[in-house]
């Protein structure tokens, strides 16, 4: 593996139990190093055999995070982007399935010259080459790699062996391991117990890896005595034992780690001296607004199919946190099962009493669809602020067709192929697609926004780029009927063929989008649609008839000039990808096709 010069590597591993927060730790460290002036890249290595999480159940994996270049990745990449305000790419997420697939493909092509293909060296070399590939994509000072799973998992062993070999090849001044462990608090004994951490480090040592820094997650702060004990039994300097007790919000984790001097220990061990003091004033102010907002509270209901597992909507939940801070209000979230709305005994006025905004979340399949449609109908008829995302927009179109346009059999062909009024239909390019993984319309595409609409008011610009993950689209045959009954098509693809944003003219805030705005919301750059939605919910809660639609200046980028006239008359099935003359920002280069048209 040819390693680019001067790049330093940090590997983050976890022990004792899962869900300790390796992703938040990695993102927080990356944010701190970036705030000191270093160029940081961050990635996730997942040990499962799936090529990517695109076809995995939300109940097992949580949300699928889509990057600009169309990669379907782990939700931790969302944390990376939100904390660092940097876009990730296909190269930022590597699964063991992708590694094995690449090795097997090379063997079939004869690239191993008839040799016996083994985990060592072939699989390990493939992992090391992928890391070098990311390093070559940018001029980075530090690359942080989170290794998924828990020490002791069989699936993680090749990743750990690759890390061991790399440290031997590069030297201790170029690569270090941060091991996140759990120090449980035993309430009956009023004690923090270090034995699980000791055993976790012992298991890591069995792979040939001595951790350089230990981050100890705990319910209570670690005393100096506890840190000394952990350092003594784990062969780590007590200054390299970092305490990370529970925080009120994940956005306080970087501030806690800064106080514990984690970033300074990393800089010292890697021999990095060119840095400056971090300015976290805006971040600190954001945390203050999250914890102690001065503008009151709003109540938002999220109607979805996977509400039993909130990680399925992780980016939506975080985007609402960002929007709460930007509006200086606390956003109380109520997760509601879509199926509940299908019951004839469900009392919407009672169950949604006190709700100031309704968001219908994305998803796939027909389960709960009629319930989503009923929640949308209630939001429309009661003039409650509404935001629909992806499938939420498609359901909003079906509801409007049935109950406003007088098309009672209206539906999506995803749910009823024989509908007389298929207002949502399979995209022309998708009709011959047989495989499921990586074949949807994925990644960042441009959208032209119509002036004088709510969408234009919150974005403050005519041209935007948003991330997509869908196969079905609005059927343009029905656009005249929708417009006649008060629907505004406020955002479309540059050629005018794909409907991206819809809104109702006479509703205080009824906006639905085909794309996923939640994927681009950041701590210091809240997404305009979420800012506008929460602002509308606040106005509704305050009894204001019409909310102020303009977004704050720092919420969105500088408004761009009006684009050239939109081209019309594209033939069905013609390429509706991203024309070069409409590209607003370059996509990060990926390492494989992800179904982009």
Swiss-Prot record:
Membrane-spanning intervals of the chain: none
Binding site for ATP: 19-24, 76
Pathway assigned in UniProt: Pyrimidine metabolism; CTP biosynthesis via de novo pathway; CTP from UDP: step 2/2
Pfam families xref list: CTP_synth_N, GATase
Any one Gene Ontology molecular-function term assigned to this protein's record: identical protein binding
Biological processes, Gene Ontology terms: 'de novo' CTP biosynthetic process; pyrimidine nucleobase biosynthetic process
Region (Amidoligase domain): 1-272
Residues the entry annotates as binding L-glutamine: 59, 363, 391-394, 414, 471
Residues noted as binding CTP in the record, renumbered to the chain: 18, 153-155, 193-198, 229
Entry EC number(s): 6.3.4.2
Any one GO CC term of the record: cytosol
Active site: 390 (nucleophile), 516, 518
Notes on how activity is controlled: Allosterically activated by GTP, when glutamine is the substrate; GTP has no effect on the reaction when ammonia is the substrate. The allosteric effector GTP functions by stabilizing the protein conformation that binds the tetrahedral intermediate(s) formed during glutamine hydrolysis. Inhibited by the product CTP, via allosteric rather than competitive inhibition.
Positions bound to Mg(2+): 76, 146
Known catalytic reactions: UTP + L-glutamine + ATP + H2O = CTP + L-glutamate + ADP + phosphate + 2 H(+); L-glutamine + H2O = L-glutamate + NH4(+); UTP + NH4(+) + ATP = CTP + ADP + phosphate + 2 H(+)
Function in brief: Catalyzes the ATP-dependent amination of UTP to CTP with either L-glutamine or ammonia as the source of nitrogen. Regulates intracellular CTP levels through interactions with the four ribonucleotide triphosphates.
Further comment: CTPSs have evolved a hybrid strategy for distinguishing between UTP and CTP. The overlapping regions of the product feedback inhibitory and substrate sites recognize a common feature in both compounds, the triphosphate moiety. To differentiate isosteric substrate and product pyrimidine rings, an additional pocket far from the expected kinase/ligase catalytic site, specifically recognizes the cytosine and ribose portions of the product inhibitor.
Family the entry assigns: Belongs to the CTP synthase family.
Alphabetized PANTHER family for the sequence: CTP SYNTHASE (PTHR11550), CTP SYNTHASE-RELATED (PTHR11550:SF0)
Name used for this protein in its record: CTP synthase
Organism encoding this protein: Chlorobium luteolum (strain DSM 273 / BCRC 81028 / 2530)
Lineage: Bacteria, Pseudomonadati, Chlorobiota, Chlorobiia, Chlorobiales
Gene responsible for this protein: pyrG
